[in-house]
Each structure stands twice: as C-alpha cells, then as structure tokens.
From Swiss-Prot:
InterPro entries for this protein: aa-tRNA-synt_IIb, aa-tRNA-synth_II, aa-tRNA-synth_II/BPL/LPL, Ser-tRNA-ligase_type_1, Ser-tRNA-synth_1_N, SerRS_1_N_sf, SerRS_core, tRNA-bd_arm
Gene: serS
Reported function: Catalyzes the attachment of serine to tRNA(Ser). Is also able to aminoacylate tRNA(Sec) with serine, to form the misacylated tRNA L-seryl-tRNA(Sec), which will be further converted into selenocysteinyl-tRNA(Sec).
UniProt name for this protein: Serine--tRNA ligase
Subunit structure: Homodimer. The tRNA molecule binds across the dimer.
Length: 425
C-alpha cells in the first residue's frame, strides 16, 4: 500500500511513475482517491468543530441547573449536535472503506533503477555465471529423463489430483528432499538466515498483507468452508508473522529462510512450460524473507540475490540474472531481479528465483514497523523476499544439465552426501 500523503503531495509524479506499470491499472483512480480523501478531511474538520461545540454546550448545563434555569433547549441542542456527529462519523467510515478499497489495488511505485519496457523481452541482463551446457549427443528433456529413470510419475500424479501434479518416486523423492536440505543448510549455516517452518494455510488478512489479495484472489487456492487460503509462497506466512508488530531497530535486519509447499491455481496455459516440472499447481520452494530499515534495503537486496546465487553456484548450474522492466515488474515490487537457470531442452534460461525489494509497500498493508528506542516514533520497515530457490525447477535443471549419453544423471558434488550416491541410473 502506498503512502496517501505521498499521493496528495506528489500526485502527478506518482501517476507518471505508475504509468506503463504493466498492471491492469488506471492511474486516474489516484485522482479519485485524493478527492475522497479531501472530502473525508473536510468532514473530520466539521466533526472536530461539532465536538468542540458539544463540549461548550455540555459545560453550560450544570451552570444553568445550578442557577435554576431551564435546560430543555440546551439538552435538545446537545442531542442535535450528537446526531450530526453520528451522521458525519458514518460518512467518514463509508469514505474510509472506499479509500481503502482503492488503495489496496494501487501497485507499488517502481524504483528509478527499474528499466523501461512492457514485456519480459525488455528485461535487462546484468550477469551470467557459467556457460550453457553443451552435449555431444541429443539431450533429453527432464520429463523424459524423470520417467525413464523412474523418478517422476506424471500419469499417477494426474490420476491422484489432476493435471500439473507430480508424484516423486524413489531416488526422485530423495533428490527433491536432498535439494531442500542442501538449500536450508546453505542459507542457515553459511548465509545467516534463521529457519522457519510456517503454516501452509493462512487467513485473508495475511494474503492481503503481502499483496496477493484482493487483486489475485482468483489465482489462489481457497478452502471454501473456512476462508483459509493455501499459500502461494512462504513469503505470505513468514512476512505476516510480524503483522501489527513494532520491531526493535537494533534487531534488524531479520532474515528468515523457510521451506514450504506452494500452491498456485494459475499455472500457465501454453507452450512447453506446461510439460514437466516447470509449471505445477503444487511445488516446493525455499523462500528467503528479510525485514530491515529503509536505508538498508537496497544493500540487503544485493545480498539477497547473492544468497540465491550461492545455491546455484554450489550445484554448478549455469544461470543469468536479469533486472525486471516496468511492464513485467508485478504488483508489489519496487525493484526485482530474476535469476534464470539454463535449461537445455528449452535452449534458453528459465526463471528459478525472483528477488524483490518491496520497500514499505507490504509493511503498510501489514502494519509492520520498527523503532530504534522506546521514545522514538515507529517507522515502517522495508520488506524483501526471494526464492532461494524453487525446488522442482532445480530438479529439472539438474536432470537436464547433468545427464549422460547413456541416459544416467550425475549427482552434483554438493548433493552427494545427501543422496548417498554418485549417479542416477
């Protein structure tokens, strides 16, 4: 959520910044919310004047009674003032609802470093690590490797649940679990994160706090009989752990790493991404979430990207980093980087992590603040999160990049102690 004061004082600047944002968003609603806010503020001024008048009249009543005067008219005036205040309070409540409705649907303001552009083709590559894997044979896609090696069962996943659900079997299940443990160990032992194992279901306030609601409700899995939502990412429960709290400034930054299953109703509809593990309704991920002071947040974003990189480097998987343009930025981020792993079957890089700085956008929605001393006025924290990284896509990348001509797959060195083997065959 944006700062309403900033909308009032920098209206045209904000409208310009939000143009070409890539969201289905009409910047003219900013004028609407400012008009509603002006109406609300005028009524609040009237209410204060009425309350002052009521206090003055109220003070007259005991004086008149003491003097033996009739207070009938004064009491009637008191009731009339009270009715006006009650009516104005109702108008303010109605305006608050209208303002909040709009404010929850206004996307974040892009950082000036965000490139101009409309689609992912306009994202700017800023780094590559490793070289795309070359083969002296025709490589297989991960879905064929997973089936041939009896690691993945797409047919039974479909039978049990439906399309885009997968059963991991035998060494495939062990590979998934080994990657999870490797990522968590890397982030907690080496990168300084505190591990969290969060709930996989959250309430509406939590989904609103991180920005999934109200805009993306149709993309979420909702438990109809009680109003819970299955989490699309551990970002939601971990960020909302601190909702409506004021944190101690000297404890910042707070850094959490969380493994969870993730659930996405909208999983894509066309192209090769619909095959295999790339777009699933249920998948596993290790998420990195940070809470920090505003002056720390962009340095912490750089570190967050490096932490996500570290697990891919540890696995020897080639990747690149792109800075996301305005039109591809999404609803909540002020600045975002995608890390894309090389996928031979696609002959291109495929997103495996997104690392974002939300500045105070989520903190305002979730009311997460900090202060440096007990007497200091609380300020909103900045929140950041990044995939550290997606597990299923890592499985796919390992199968494709480490495959051998005979159809076997070499286990990356970093996973051998977890897998207790050197080769999948």
């Amino acid at each position: 959520m944006l700062d309403l004061k900033k909308l009032r004082s920098n209206t045209e600047e904000v409208k310009k910044a939000l143009s070409n944002r890539g969201e289905d968003f009409d910047v003219n609603v900013i004028d609407e919310v400012i008009a509603l806010d002006e109406e609300r503020r005028k009524i609040l001024v009237d209410v204060e004047a009425l309350k002052k008048q009521r206090n003055e009249v109220s003070a007259e009543i005991p004086k008149r009674k003491k003097a033996g005067e009739d207070v009938t008219e004064v009491m009637a005036e008191m009731r009339e003032i009270g009715d006006k205040i009650k009516a104005d309070d109702a108008k303010v409540a109605e305006l608050n609802d209208k303002i909040n409705y709009i404010m929850l649907r206004i996307p974040n303001i892009p950082n000036p470093a965000v490139p101009e552009g409309e689609t992912d083709e306009d994202n700017v590559e800023i780094k590559r690590w490793g070289e795309p894997t070359k083969f002296n044979f025709e490589p297989k896609a991960h879905w064929d490797l997973g089936t041939d090696l009896d690691l993945l069962d797409f047919e039974r996943g479909g039978k049990v649940a439906g399309s885009r659900f997968t059963v991991y079997k035998g060494m495939g299940a062990r590979l998934e679990r080994s990657i999870i443990n490797y990522f968590l160990d890397k982030h907690t032992f080496e990168n300084g994160y505190t591990e969290v194992l969060p709930p996989y279901m959250v309430n509406r306030d939590s989904m609103t706090g991180t920005g999934q609601l109200p805009k993306f409700e149709e993309d979420a899995f909702k438990v109809e009989n009680n109003g819970y939502f299955l989490i699309p990412t551990a970002e939601v429960p971990v960020t909302n752990m601190y909702r409506n709290e004021t944190l101690e400034g000297d404890k910042l930054p707070i850094k959490h790493a969380a493994y969870s299953a993730c659930f996405r109703a909208e999983a894509g509809s066309a192209g090769r991404d619909t095959r295999g593990l790339i777009r699933q309704h249920q998948f596993n991920k290790v998420e990195l979430v940070k809470f920090c002071k505003p002056e720390q947040s962009y340095e912490e974003l750089d570190k967050l990207v490096q932490d996500a990189e570290s697990v891919l480097q540890g696995l020897g998987l080639p990747y690149r980093i792109v800075r996301i343009c305005k039109g591809d930025l999404g609803f909540t981020a002020a600045l975002k980087y995608d890390i894309e792993v090389w996928m031979p079957s696609y002959n291109r890089y495929v997103e495996i992590s997104s690392c974002s700085n939300f500045e105070d956008f989520q903190a305002r929605r979730a009311n997460i603040k900090y202060k440096n001393s007990p007497k200091e006025k609380p300020q909103f924290v900045h929140t950041l999160n990044g995939s550290g990284v997606a597990i299923g896509r890592t499985v796919a990348a390992i199968l494709e990049n480490y495959q051998q001509e005979d159809g076997s797959v070499v286990i990356p060195e970093a996973l051998k102690e977890y897998m207790r083997c050197d080769l999948l065959k």
